[in-house]
Amino acid sequence: MAMAMALRRLSSSIDKPIRPLIRSTSCYMSSLPSEAVDEKERSRVTWPKQLNAPLEEVDPEIADIIEHEKARQWKGLELIPSENFTSVSVMQAVGSVMTNKYSEGYPGARYYGGNEYIDMAETLCQKRALEAFRLDPEKWGVNVQPLSGSPANFHVYTALLKPHERIMALDLPHGGHLSHGYQTDTKKISAVSIFFETMPYRLDESTGYIDYDQMEKSATLFRPKLIVAGASAYARLYDYARIRKVCNKQKAVMLADMAHISGLVAANVIPSPFDYADVVTTTTHKSLRGPRGAMIFFRKGVKEINKQGKEVLYDFEDKINQAVFPGLQGGPHNHTITGLAVALKQATTSEYKAYQEQVLSNSAKFAQTLMERGYELVSGGTDNHLVLVNLKPKGIDGSRVEKVLEAVHIASNKNTVPGDVSAMVPGGIRMGTPALTSRGFVEEDFAKVAEYFDKAVTIALKVKSEAQGTKLKDFVSAMESSSTIQSEIAKLRHEVEEFAKQFPTIGFEKETMKYKN
């Protein structure tokens, strides 16, 4: 009954105009001006005034840190492929009164009162999630409450596996993710590998592509209950049909973790895992460009007709929902769910599709320019939003290059490449195009970014040659103590900043910034 009432309220409210939450571009969600408050409504206590005061008045230290971060985002080049710039409208929703409400449970079945509008927001978010990925609500459901991607994956394992049942996933040094159960020969790094037995599949190091033949052989021996199709540093498309075949052979669940590529999938510019997977997880803040959260999609309805002619139904929905709450979470973050609903609406627009097409074009141009400048890319190129540069042929590693890039205001991240033995001093750099594409970068701009990257690597090689030891701290010391090196860094940093400042800011206006120089 409560669910029906919530749905009726939702359907009756969709066509009603919504009054704007704020009157300016500021993202501070303060109350109405004090002069608009009737004298009779004034409290006889003092704290409501502080609660309604703006951030710069209540906490100037934090306000100042935020202003510095704005300047960093404006003057720098954001190349971390798991980052993006979300919209003002999403930030307004995330910074709204929806953060105040507790709502353990699900729409229509809460353990707290007063959730009429929380139910409406979550139900609308679920509806938009299915629409964004073109899913039939009779065949797919979605949970929008997971707090982030790693917890979302653990929710799925907990829901569908017994303790110490077996998981196969792409090896972390070959582009996988910690949450897929990474462990070394001597240590269980991810908690997933503590509670479940895990075995990696890997790339064919001669090509940089996933070795599906070896995966199938390993699965035959290991007999996993669940196989993960997903990565954090793999620049090629997954062969979902091939993994589905392996899963069918082993009677294993196929989990697609599309955290990095969900925006591309939503825009229908790369193949969708939904055609093959049983369960799909994703974060919401990477290429999808929403707030920091996660979703779990699951098949429902008729799975097959058994030998007796009876329908066999998927049993994922109740198991996954119960694993999220009450299994591993309490109250959901309603402000995040509300912001996600906004992002999912944006993901169905023509502007969004054009953006994701540009993400791919920029990535291809970036890869081409890097290779023309003599850099080796793992797999020899890219089919998605990222490139993984193998720096070992250049005689340098990702940790050292990352330090120089950061000094010149280029944000990237060191990353393992096949053959690495240390995650702290890996041989690669991972870079992506979603964030800068959100700022309006096109192909020719990424050719320029590749030039800046090349200059930074050249500086890193000079620093390495001058360092008095082989440790990273020796490299940093040499970089900071050499006046010649510092001069080169300052020159490149100025070039980067002047270039970056030509492009629009996202989430705030340049004119409102405190630090504009």
From Swiss-Prot:
Top-level class of the enzyme under EC nomenclature: transferase
Keyword terms, alphabetized: Cytoplasm, Mitochondrion, One-carbon metabolism, Pyridoxal phosphate, Transferase, Transit peptide, Ubl conjugation
GO biological process: circadian rhythm; glycine biosynthetic process from serine; glycine metabolic process; L-serine metabolic process; photorespiration; plant-type hypersensitive response; response to cold; response to light stimulus
Residue interval of the organelle targeting sequence: 1-30
Any GO molecular function: glycine hydroxymethyltransferase activity
Disruption phenotype: Displays a lethal photorespiratory phenotype when grown at ambient carbon dioxide.
Cofactor: pyridoxal 5'-phosphate
Processing after translation: Ubiquitinated.
Chain positions found as N6-(pyridoxal phosphate)lysine: K286
CDD domains: SHMT
Gene induction: Circadian-regulation. Induction by light.
Localisation per UniProt entry: Mitochondrion; Cytoplasm
Pathway: One-carbon metabolism; tetrahydrofolate interconversion
Keyword Transit peptide: yes
Alphabetized InterPro entries for the sequence: PyrdxlP-dep_Trfase, PyrdxlP-dep_Trfase_major, PyrdxlP-dep_Trfase_small, Ser_HO-MeTrfase, Ser_HO-MeTrfase-like, Ser_HO-MeTrfase_PLP_BS, SHMT-like_dom
Subunit structure: Homotetramer. Interacts with GLU1. Interacts with UBP16.
Miscellaneous comment text of the record: Recessive mutant shmt1-1 (shm1-3) shows enhanced susceptibility to salt stress and to biotrophic and necrotrophic pathogens.
Role played: Functions in the photorespiratory pathway in catalyzing the interconversion of serine and glycine. Involved in controlling cell damage caused by abiotic stress, such as high light and salt and the hypersensitive defense response of plants.
Family: Belongs to the SHMT family.
NCBIfam families found in the cross-reference section: PRK00011.1
Protein name, as recorded: Serine hydroxymethyltransferase 1, mitochondrial
Originating organism: Arabidopsis thaliana
Lineage, opening ranks: Eukaryota, Viridiplantae, Streptophyta, Embryophyta, Tracheophyta
